[in-house]
Curated annotation (Swiss-Prot):
Belongs to the universal ribosomal protein uS10 family. GO terms for biological process: translation. Keywords: Ribonucleoprotein, Ribosomal protein. Part of the 30S ribosomal subunit. It comes from Prochlorococcus marinus (strain MIT 9312). This is Small ribosomal subunit protein uS10. GO terms for molecular function: structural constituent of ribosome; tRNA binding. The lineage of its organism: Bacteria, Bacillati, Cyanobacteriota, Cyanophyceae, Synechococcales. Involved in the binding of tRNA to the ribosomes.
Length: 106
């Protein structure tokens, strides 16, 4: 039974448009895991997704005149090994910025 508890892990995937906000959120999660004596591996940077939008500048003619906009979605991965009940409670109570999307898998 203790072997299955030792093999438990929590995988946290973070997404954000702002890289600095994402890195601060990763630091908070890792500090929380370290204070509850769980081992955290990461943040592992995943590939950044670029989405480019092409828009006509003029509402009427001039199709040659276009404008490009892009959004970049930065992603990070954190694995927390051997989490305790304290670790899970601390992660649930953690206050992270609203611009960061969090996906947790047990």
């Amino acid at each position: 039974m203790t072997a299955s508890i030792a093999q438990q892990k929590i995988r946290i995937r973070l997404k954000a448009f702002d890289r600095r906000m994402l890195d601060l959120s990763c630091e908070k999660i890792i500090q929380t895991a370290d204070t509850t004596s769980a081992s955290a591996i990461g943040p592992i940077p995943l590939p950044t997704k670029r989405k480019i939008y092409c828009v006509l500048r003029s509402p009427h003619v001039d199709k040659d005149s276009r404008e490009h906009f892009e959004t970049r979605t930065h992603r990070r991965l954190i694995d927390i090994y051997s989490p305790s009940a304290k670790t899970i409670d601390a992660l649930m109570k953690l206050d992270l910025p609203s611009g960061v999307d969090i996906e947790v898998k047990l």
